[in-house]
Amino acid sequence: MPENTIPEITSALSQLGKPPQLRNVGTPSTVELQEHATLLAAATSDNTRRAYRSAIQHFLAWGGALPADEPAIIHYLLAHAAALNPRTLALRLTALSQWHVHQGFPDPASLPTVRKTLTGISRVHGKPKKKAKALPVEDLERIIVALEQFDTVKAKRDSALLQIGFFGGFRRSEVASLEVEFIKWQAEGIAITLPRSKTDQEGEGIVKAIPYGDDVCCPATALRTWLAAAGITSGPIFRRVDKWGKIGADALHESSVNTILAECARRAQLDYVPELSSHSLRRGMATSAHRAGADFRDIKRQGGWRHDGTVQGYIEEASQFEENAAGSLLRRNSNNK
């Protein structure tokens, strides 16, 4: 190397200064720990966290202690095997497992003997899952006609809520949390943007379009009527209305959707009110849309379902008497005449 280049290199190195002081990567700061805890919590939905919290409280109220061991969890399962649905026990077992994992303890809930115990309980005590009855669009129309007899703000709210929930294929948590800012009024109807949903936990946003109706039901018109009557221009759309007609400022609790549907169904004199729940609106949209000739893909998109199997189950329910092997046999003679 030429001697005259050495001073240049020395000068360049001196200009680099001292290397930055690096913190030990294995010791996160308090702020980072808090941020990490927030991100971990955000990875689980609010409903799931509430369910897990309830499960842990049930285990502790029974007499369990945390951290738990294998015999205690098996004892807990056996104590509730006959009284609780196996699906409920499975959820509580998952909650116990998650608690131990996140607290840094060995997870006894995932041990083979515990899982086999739950499998045995499911086989001995398992029962078919109770499903909400689908609300046919014809019965929704009966409800809307019954509500039109009451010129009250509550009736207007209920009409808008049930129509938006049905034709939008919304979950009860989604329809209860809708805000005016989510609505875009267009010439063909309304477009509703959900900033987050059960199948969109990352918040990419889902848009559901509901066209104007030309018969008994018109969700967009019902919504506009309710908003005008309530004087709502921003914030939560569906709010509490007391017996004097006073409108609250906060959004309805999602459980209120069940109550509203049941009350309105009784007014319409439907004879299967005990079989209804908020999920009846989503199921009803899917089954009624299939009967009306809607495409599978369109039904799936409107309901925001992630899995084809869920939608296929609703379609099979809607056509159980149409595409029926027994029906073909029973009608064979009339078809030959």
Task: Specify the residue positions occupied by each region the protein language model found.
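Extreme N-terminal leader/anchor segments
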Residues: 2-17, 31
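Conserved catalytic core of the tyrosine transesterase superfamily
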Residues: 12, 24-37, 42-44, 48-50, ...
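Hotspots on structured nucleic-acid-binding interfaces, especially in canonical RNA/DNA-binding domains
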Residues: 45-62
